[in-house]
């Protein structure tokens, strides 16, 4: 176990110099008091959520749960939004962007006063992206899988997350239904 003075975040907040004075004043500017986080591990929550990614629609609530857990464990949580890779709507393919997410994850963890990370993900490319970035940074991290994508409903029937599109596309092509 490391001491409070050994925390990586103390490089930003600990020294009695101009730069750290500036860091502390900016955090106060955000409405935080130094006692809320000084001496506690600052835990970055890498959250690849956006409103276009159906894999992660439940992440806003999950982030709140993670924050509560970090606080209860004695840490200080900060959410760090990251590139969201939703296979369903991104063109031409999310594979092109997976390495961007890895680089962004690494740089978010490197450039901010972060002592450890909670990595969130769920889609095919999000999971390896956040893991590769955190591994490159070599900080204590834990991965929280998003779980299954929320399913939809249509005409009273529960739809699968991706398989029903093929069934209903065949029905549409056969002239048995329209898009309404």
Q: Where in the sequence are the language-model features?
A:
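Glycine-rich phosphate/diphosphate-binding loop of Rossmann-like nucleotide-binding domains
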Residues: 35, 44, 50-84
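N-terminal amphipathic/basic leader segments beginning at the initiator methionine
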Residues: 1-40
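Electropositive phosphate-/nucleotide-binding environments in soluble metabolic enzymes
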Residues: 16-20, 24, 39, 56-64, ...
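Residue-level "edge-of-site" marker
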Residues: 40, 83, 147
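Glycine-rich oxoanion-binding loops at beta->alpha junctions
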Residues: 22-33, 71, 75-119, 175-178
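Gly/Ser/Thr-rich loops at beta-strand to alpha-helix junctions
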Residues: 49-56, 121-127
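Gly-rich Lys/Arg/Thr-decorated short loops/hinges at beta-loop-alpha junctions or inter-strand turns
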Residues: 2-14, 43-50, 80-92, 163-167
């Amino acid at each position: 176990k490391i001491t409070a003075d050994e925390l990586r975040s103390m490089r930003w907040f600990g020294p009695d110099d101009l730069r750290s004075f500036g860091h502390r004043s900016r955090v106060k500017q955000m409405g935080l008091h130094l006692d809320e986080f000084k001496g506690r591990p600052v835990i970055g929550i890498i959250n690849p959520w956006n409103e276009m990614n159906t894999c992660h629609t439940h992440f806003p609530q999950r982030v709140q749960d993670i924050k509560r857990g970090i606080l209860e464990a004695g840490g200080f949580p900060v959410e760090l939004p990251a590139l969201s890779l939703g296979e369903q709507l991104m063109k031409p393919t999310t594979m092109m962007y997976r390495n961007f997410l890895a680089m962004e994850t690494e740089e978010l963890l490197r450039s901010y006063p972060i002592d450890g990370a909670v990595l969130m993900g769920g889609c095919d490319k999000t999971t390896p992206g956040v893991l590769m970035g955190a591994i490159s940074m070599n900080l204590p991290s834990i991965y929280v899988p998003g779980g299954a994508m929320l399913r939809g409903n249509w005409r009273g029937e529960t739809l699968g997350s991706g398989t029903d599109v093929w069934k209903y596309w065949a029905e549409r092509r056969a002239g048995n239904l329209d898009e309404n």
